[in-house]
Amino acid sequence: HEAKTENAVQANMELEFKRNRERFGFLKWGSSAFHNMLVVPPGSGIVHQVNLEYLGRVVFNTNGLLYPDSVVGTDSHTTMIDGLGVAGWGVGGIEAEAAMLGQPMSMVLPGVVGFKLVGKLRNGVTATDLVLTVTQMLRKHGVVGKFVEFYGEGMGELSLADRATIANMSPEYGATMGFFPVDHVTLQYLKLTGRKDETISMIESYLLANKMFVDYSEPQVERVYSSHIELNLSDVEPCISGPKRPHDRVPLKEMKADWHACLDNRVGFKGFAIPKEAQVKVAEFNFHGSPAQLRHGDVVIAAITSCTNTSSSVMLGAALVAKKACELGLEVKPWIKTVLLQALGVVTKYLAKSGLQKYLNQLGFNIVGYGCTTCIGNSGDIDESVASAITGNDIVAAAVLSGNRNFEGRVHPLTRANYLASPPLVVAYALAGTVDIDFESEPIGVGKDGKKVFFRDIWPTSEEVAVVVNSNVLPDMFRATYQAITEGNATWNLLSVPEGTLYSWDPTSTYIHEPPYFKDMSMSPPGPHGVKNAYCLLNFGDSITTDHISPAGSIHKDSPAAKYLLERGVDRRDFNSYGVAVVMMRLWHVHFANIRIVNKLLKGEVGPKTIHIPSREKLSVFDAAMRYKSEGQDTIILAGAEYGIGSSRDWAAKGPMLLGVKAVIAKSFERIHRSNLVGMGIIPLCFKAGEDADSLGLTGHERFTIDLPSNVGEIRPGQDVAVVTDTGKSFSCILRFDTEVELAYFDHGGILQYVIRNLIHSKH
């Protein structure tokens, strides 16, 4: 975001339309070219919240034929709809495009993990504390590729918004979906959000008749699940997660000790390796004429943001914290970048009705708009003086956000420590100005009367929050907000677009280009490809994220993408995010360009480089890949567990394909990324259980041969495949084409090529 004032929403929406006119025009053209395509106008809110409160049907009624609602979406947090009792999950953009063209979705029948909830949350514990606890438990249990179904008497204690928060975080705990069956709480929510009474009655009758409705006030039959896990809600305690992964939960009472351990620990998910003598460093700087200081752990970004933590209880809870803080005379340091980004306009309405928005404004949390910002790295620059103090003194600065992901380099390039927290805790940490604090024994600040103010002085009780929620969140707010979806807004309605069913590509555009995947495509499938004497382009450890592979968020001023745009006359103020700019297509060297990436070929060095094995030269990943391609050499990637964790970003598969990567050999893959690799024709292989590159003695300096039959009919999903190296080592891997149709995609060179050939054949 750019503007942060009382009229920030309008100012930022105008900027959004100005910068995204070409993109919005393309989408609006699509909505007129295709009869069954609805485009929700920009500024309406984040898609998952719109799904939950407006688009979700729960039960479809098509000319009197009733059947359950379902959804797939190109964002991994599509799972939020599972909180409403609608089966839904995220898929890669490639797979979604194929589905839009009529290709059925295929999957291996998943195991179902039963998650039993009992008891009740303690006073002052938030839905965010619960979801971070659930995320840690399920990551430890292991649920990748599985469904999780929540049940138990504790369900009656959770609001629909609480359930949606847990469902939203399914990608962070690794499940395909986290499902909450429909009950009376679901029906009450449908009424709250403005659904018609007759529709709600139809939903209840259909689900009761089909034994798909649950009444938690009655005794429940214990169902049989693939595996089982249980949580007593009274055991959940206030917590945050970080500094580098969503499932690294830290109880609030242990945060100060955990922070100091992270400073000491070697570089890793829980370590920064700051020498003892450097841990007390104070960076002096000048902030717009006033002296200022930064220390390790100081907060420079505090953001109430994302689609995850948008429930009325946590949003109004944050506002109550702000109210108490303002009344006691507390302030946020002026160099902390504060962000309040809403998932939808209803939040704006109930914050205004409650009279609490003014206190958030007073602390710098003005509403800046509706959409994805800090959570994906789109919060804008921090002040230049703060940035210089961080880089000049090697300060481990912190961001605290109510988002769902905190992977390295994602939130901001200069915040090495990133913590996920509830919206009320975001406000508390902004007031404290540091994560290096024990909230139980140390004051957050000094009030206007000179008295020390503690965390307990500003934290609202559950009863206080409930009173504000019940009196300020009303059905009419939802009806008024979603009326705008059908009516649009003035700027969207005035946007002119070309007519016709074929889009006219503009070759001079830096934004939208014709994709290169069908260039020179013949009607005959190319057939399966093996890998011959391939070099290892990159050798990774565990938890390589799609942010490591392919950037998202803002385009940094010194990046190759920025250089490309500047050379084409694009003003820096008009740079947009990687995710929507054509630099993704033209600048293949933005892939694997994350400054925090660790490539084992570099023997401990951190950064986006690799070794060109034949020459032993250290090059950028792009330059090394292009040299291999020019020499006619195949390349592969070695990786550890959870390869491709994070966003469902299809560019994390498109980019490696364009770089010439033929296969990825990993301990395990995150579900959506594996699917995306298949969709782009890259072979996913898994080491056998108990094995990895290190245990097999692989350094990445070998050459790898993977023999596959030239006839796809001779390949089976999940079969063993031999991998042979030029050093004489050989080992067996599991071929992670999971279904017969995925083998067909591989035979055709990718899913879109398969679908297009089939469409052409069907026309003839």
Curated annotation (Swiss-Prot):
Q: Does the keyword Membrane apply?
A: no
Q: Which SUPFAM superfamilies match?
A: Aconitase iron-sulfur domain, LeuD/IlvD-like
The answer to whether the entry has keyword Metal-binding is yes
List of residues binding [4Fe-4S] cluster: C307, C372, C375
Q: Which family does it belong to?
A: Belongs to the aconitase/IPM isomerase family.
Q: Required co-factor?
A: [4Fe-4S] cluster
From the UniProt annotation, give the residues forming the signal peptide: none
- Entry-linked InterPro entries: AcnA_IRP_Swivel (IPR044137), Acnase/IPM_dHydase_lsu_aba_1/3 (IPR015931), Acoase/IPM_deHydtase_lsu_aba (IPR001030), Aconitase/3IPM_dehydase_swvl (IPR015928), Aconitase/IRP2 (IPR006249), Aconitase_4Fe-4S_BS (IPR018136), Aconitase_4Fe-4S_dom (IPR036008), AconitaseA/IPMdHydase_ssu_swvl (IPR000573)
Alphabetical GO CC annotations of the entry are: cytoplasm
NCBIfam families under this entry? Answer: aconitase_1, PRK09277.1, PRK12881.1
How cofactor binds (record note)?
Binds 1 [4Fe-4S] cluster per subunit.
Kindly tell me the pathway this chain contributes to: Carbohydrate metabolism; glyoxylate and dicarboxylate metabolism
Q: Which domain of life is it from?
A: Eukaryota
GO MF annotation, one = aconitate hydratase activity
* Catalytic activity annotation: citrate = D-threo-isocitrate
What protein name applies here?
Aconitate hydratase
GO terms under biological process? glyoxylate cycle
Describe its function.
Answer: Catalyzes the isomerization of citrate to isocitrate via cis-aconitate.
The Enzyme Commission number assigned here is: 4.2.1.3
Database matches in Gene3D superfamilies: 6.10.190.10, Aconitase, domain 3, Aconitase, domain 4
**Per UniProt, where does substrate bind?**
D75, S76, H77, R405, R410, R568, S648, R649
The listed locations are:
Cytoplasm
Q: Which organism is it from?
A: Cucumis melo var. conomon
